[in-house]
Amino acid sequence: MENDSAQHVRFQNLQEDQMTFNQVFEHIVAFMRSRPAGNYRLIVGTDSQIHPQKTIFITGIVIRNKGKGVWACIRKVTVPRKMLQLHERISYETSLSEEIVSLFTEERKRQLIDIVLPHIYQGASFSMEGHIDIGAGKKNKTRKFVQEMVTRLEAIGVEPKIKPDAFVA
């Protein structure tokens, strides 16, 4: 049974449209069960694009098995105005990622960990990352927001990654 916050959220990829979060989670479980001794990274990240009358946000969920493939999907959110303030846009990107991360409840995370757990001594692993579309370089306009956004993701229990390591955002 889906919780209330997950019922309105829809995802898509090249194979399926209008997936619920439960369907997404089942795809992730099936992907991991196909090779339970894998090195898995569950990654959530959001990027945005400003258009003349709107700003489009794309949140990606990627489950990656190092050297063995990925399964991924996206969620698209449209804000009906140009979000020109950089801090507002970066903060909203982070909020959308936080929303999706929150759908991975402790019970769901435990279910994913339990897939790889019997294979830990053979090198299996599982981690969860939040990718943020910001960088710490001296010329990067987003560098002043790094600490704030990193702290937000750490607070919800995911490992934050920034550019150039944040490839999902």
PLM feature spans:
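Basic, amphipathic N-terminal segments that precede the first structured/catalytic domain
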Residues: 1-45, 49-50
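Acidic, metal-ligating active-site segments
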Residues: 44-45, 51-75
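Acidic helix/loop or adjacent segment enriched in Glu/Asp that either coordinates divalent metal
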Residues: 79-116
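Extended, alpha-helix-rich binding/interface surfaces that flank or overlap catalytic cores
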Residues: 169
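Amphipathic protein-protein interaction modules
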Residues: 104-137
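Short, low-complexity, polybasic intrinsically disordered segments
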Residues: 124-166
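Argonaute/PIWI-family RNA-guided endonuclease scaffold
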Residues: 16, 71-82, 86, 150-154
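Short acidic, S/G/P-rich loop/turn micro-motifs used as interaction or catalytic elements
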Residues: 49-51, 69, 135-141
